[in-house]
Amino acid sequence: MSLNFLDFEQPIAELEAKIDSLTAVSRQDEKLDINIDEEVHRLREKSVELTRKIFADLGAWQIAQLARHPQRPYTLDYVRLAFDEFDELAGDRAYADDKAIVGGIARLDGRPVMIIGHQKGRETKEKIRRNFGMPAPEGYRKALRLMQMAERFKMPIITFIDTPGAYPGVGAEERGQSEAIARNLREMSRLGVPVVCTVIGEGGSGGALAIGVGDKVNMLQYSTYSVISPEGCASILWKSADKAPLAAEAMGIIAPRLKELKLIDSIIPEPLGGAHRNPEAMAVSLKAQLLADLADLDVLSTEDLKNRRYQRLMSYGYA
């Protein structure tokens, strides 16, 4: 896979371009009287070291860019890599099937679970079909239908959060966007089965929270979670989206800050360079965390789950 490099990764991109050029030359003429393999190996080591150096000191705005990386694994990528026998379920049984939310039954290490997550899409046509990962009310109602089904059949619920926010279109508002989100918040707090939520990319406002009320809430290392995008915050406070880097630093949108505030439980480390560099390794780490979380929750009774979830929600906003 050819990687897309972000602005702050340009020094890495330049090294990788040199490696690609040397590799191409080596393939074209195997009779060259120079040791290209040795030089390629040296450059690869240099690239890894440079990547470590850059990623050891990332700011909030750089992490926000990584969370939106076009090659970052999405919900269906993790379903393919970490689960078995996925059977997608569609529709809210009231209006439509919103493709920005995907869900269905799968097996995690042989155990039946209900998976629900945002799905953005990669190519232009798919992005439009998925509405860039911004669900309409029918998406959240589909999610709620699947959660209630999971509760009926005593299946744990696993959600993957990756959205810039709920779709703010006129049609979505007319069909009850705010009501759909509010209802999900209420109903998720009452579910009698374990709920594990993981932010895998962008966690944008109520659009994220509508599938984010859980017994365990995790974030990938380079994901974000906030009430508004840095650009939106900058436009309000400074009347300019150009101040987004400043807003990102001030808002506390990154995983370490949110864990410090006790808004999340765990930070799942990403491969060097981000999840898109090695989706398979990322899926292994994610699966291990999900299994550990479910093991912790399995010992709790239904009432304990509900009470702990309620206390968690009520603790938000207190120092």
Swiss-Prot record:
Its EC number is 2.1.3.15. One of its GO terms (cellular component) is acetyl-CoA carboxylase complex. Keywords: ATP-binding, Cytoplasm, Fatty acid biosynthesis, Fatty acid metabolism, Lipid biosynthesis, Lipid metabolism, Nucleotide-binding, Transferase. It is found in: Cytoplasm. It catalyses: N(6)-carboxybiotinyl-L-lysyl-[protein] + acetyl-CoA = N(6)-biotinyl-L-lysyl-[protein] + malonyl-CoA. InterPro entries: Acetyl_CoA_COase_a_su, ClpP/crotonase-like_dom_sf, COA_CT_C. Component of the acetyl coenzyme A carboxylase (ACC) complex. First, biotin carboxylase catalyzes the carboxylation of biotin on its carrier protein (BCCP) and then the CO(2) group is transferred by the carboxyltransferase to acetyl-CoA to form malonyl-CoA. This is Acetyl-coenzyme A carboxylase carboxyl transferase subunit alpha. It comes from Shigella sonnei (strain Ss046). The lineage of its organism: Bacteria, Pseudomonadati, Pseudomonadota, Gammaproteobacteria, Enterobacterales.
